[in-house]
């Protein structure tokens, strides 16, 4: 709903005081919202670098090549930059998805199980990158996770759900 892909059955979705259903608002709002999910595939025939260039150009990112290099360095992807995403491990794909989501320095970052496919050390490293990014850029993070340690580390406020209903 926050991305405008699904209409709410009741009520409205407002981001920064603007109704996402209003066509005039939607494009401007979505330029500063990004999303990561283990269920969203990256284009398999493009390299990591090509994937990031596509997303960077879509968002009109300035100094794109420097931004791509910085993100690949931060996420330990430089040595794989010419590898096609279809050849990557799930953990590497996860880090490419994170780089893609951070490329436009979003105001809001929606994270669906951002470290689910990562080993503990890489997961911890990715959480550190997310924390640092959010604190440096003032980004709001909305996190869906079954990992309560991750929730405690990344979230200042927590809402628990069960069967689609808020319970806490």
Predicted regions and their residues:
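Helical segment within the ABC ATPase nucleotide-binding domain
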Residues: 124-136
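Conserved ABC transporter NBD signature motif
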Residues: 11-22, 29
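Helix-to-loop junction immediately C-terminal to a conserved catalytic motif
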Residues: 3
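Conserved ABC ATPase signature
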Residues: 84-88
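Catalytic Walker B motif of ABC-type/P-loop ATPase nucleotide-binding domains
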Residues: 109-112
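Conserved ABC ATPase "signature" region
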Residues: 53, 57-80
């Amino acid at each position: 709903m926050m991305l405008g892909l699904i209409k709410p059955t009741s009520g409205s979705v407002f981001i920064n005081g603007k109704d996402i259903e209003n066509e005039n608002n939607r494009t401007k709002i979505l330029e500063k919202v990004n999303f990561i999910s283990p269920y969203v595939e990256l284009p398999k025939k493009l390299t990591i670098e090509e994937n990031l260039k596509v997303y960077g150009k879509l968002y009109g990112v300035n100094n794109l090549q420097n931004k791509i290099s910085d993100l690949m360095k931060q996420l330990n992807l430089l040595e794989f930059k010419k590898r096609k995403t279809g050849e990557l491990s799930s953990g590497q794909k996860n880090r490419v998805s994170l780089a893609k989501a951070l490329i436009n320095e979003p105001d809001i970052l929606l994270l669906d199980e951002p470290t689910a496919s990562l080993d503990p050390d890489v997961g911890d490293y990715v959480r550190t990158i997310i924390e640092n990014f959010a604190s440096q850029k003032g980004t709001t993070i909305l996190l869906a996770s079954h990992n309560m340690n991750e929730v405690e580390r990344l979230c200042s406020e927590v809402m628990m759900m069960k069967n689609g209903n808020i319970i806490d």
